[in-house]
C-alpha cells in the first residue's frame, strides 16, 4: 500500500505537495468517496479520481533521449511542431520530459511518467550538475571563463558558481568550443551566460546530466535507464550531491 498523495504524484497528475492540497480541498475520491485526510493509503485495486477524472496508474518508466536540434521539449505542441515524445510512440505510458532543452539545443534529456521523481530532480536545491558543450563566436580569454565560473549577473539575478573549460579554438574562423557545467535550470541560461560575456553561442549540446552521458547514442536515439541508474537518480533526487 502507498500513501494517496504519492500515488497521485507518480501518476503525473500533480506534485506530491499539490496532491496534498487537492486532498485537503476535497477534490480527491477513492472508490467514489471523498478523502480529505493525508494519511490514507491505497492499493493497486483502488479507484482514484482527481477533480472528477480517473487517475490512470501506470508502471513508472525512465528514458534517456539524445534530443536533436529543432525539437520541442514537451509532450505536445499546439503549433504541430515535432516534440520529444514523438520518439516514443511505441510505448503505452504517457511520458514527459524532466526539464527542457531549447528548440535549437541538442543533447541529453530525461523523460518519465513518474511525476514526483521528475519534480524532485528539477528542484534547484539538489544542485544536479548538467554539462554543456558550446561552440561560440570569438575566443574568450581566461578571465572571462573565470567570470562564468564565479557567476554572471542576468536580469533575474546572478547565476550560481559554474565550471568552465576551453576545449579547443579555431583562430582562423574565430570560434571556440567551451565546456560549461551548471546546476541551475533557468530559461536559455547557458546561451545568456555566454551572451553576457560577449560570445554568442553558435551551437549548443548537453552532454551530461549528473552521472549520465550520451555514450553509444546518436542524435534521435533513446534508451531506457537501468534499474541501477534509476536508483542513483532517486538518491540524487532525495539527497542531492550528498547522496554519494
UniProtKB/Swiss-Prot annotation:
Coiled coil: none annotated. Responsible for synthesis of pseudouridine from uracil-2633 in 23S ribosomal RNA. Residues 2-68 form the S4 RNA-binding domain. This is Ribosomal large subunit pseudouridine synthase B. One of its GO terms (molecular function) is RNA binding. Belongs to the pseudouridine synthase RsuA family. SMART domains: S4. The gene is rluB. It comes from Bacillus subtilis (strain 168). Its EC number is 5.4.99.22.
